[in-house]
Amino acid sequence: MSLAVISRDLILSQGVLLSGNEGAIGWQTLATAANTTVTSETAAGPLSNMLNNSTAFYWQASSTATQTITITTGGTQVDYIGIARHNLAQSGLTITVKFDYVTVVPARAVVDQTTMILLSEASPTTVTITIAGAGTAAKIAVLYIGQALKLERNIYVGHTPITYGRDISEINAMSENGQYIGRIVRNETRSTEITLRNLTPAWYRESLDPFIAARVPCFWAWRPLDYAAEVGFCWIEGAARPVNERSNGMMGISWNFKGIA
């Protein structure tokens, strides 16, 4: 497992800037088989593997040559790109992002972790992601691009960042005389609980509940400006039911996230 990085070093000329620390949930993606192309793919790693929410299978380039992923977004608002489970953390490898063929994220290295690039809102017709300098053919399991859901209330205290919510299933071995020999890790994931209070009735119903109802995996950043590395690719586990907290209709809700980081 590894940490995640949010890129906040980009300010676009159009749209509304992020205030900074509202939690971001990237759950809707514009990238589909109908509007996405890539320079190359393999029989075992087709483009379609990257365009669903399973982290078990990859898109894989057929060579180490420069690869360009092109998504025709048709003028729909975009403010984030999410990449989960990949091999892009290679020496010399860079990615570049362009909106309508204008560079918005200059060539930059990628670290070995879930990546969420948060941007100012824009409405490009075409988004391109160029991968150059690979020493090993590029692989990506999940690619999302779209408009992130920004939480109405910031999270301040009582929250476990997903990167620190380690859940480990392991077997510890001991000798007959009680000496520690070693351990076998059977499974390792991340988890956290999200608790939101005093949500306005309209915001909950119009903005948050569609995500709760969809129950699809998402990119999650709890406090993007202060803790940019604390991001995961997560899904809801168990019940997620809102309650009416006040006579004015204010709502509250808690749910558990399970995921990878």
Where are the language model's segments positioned?
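Short, surface-exposed beta-strand/strand-loop-strand elements in extracellular ectodomains
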Residues: 90-101
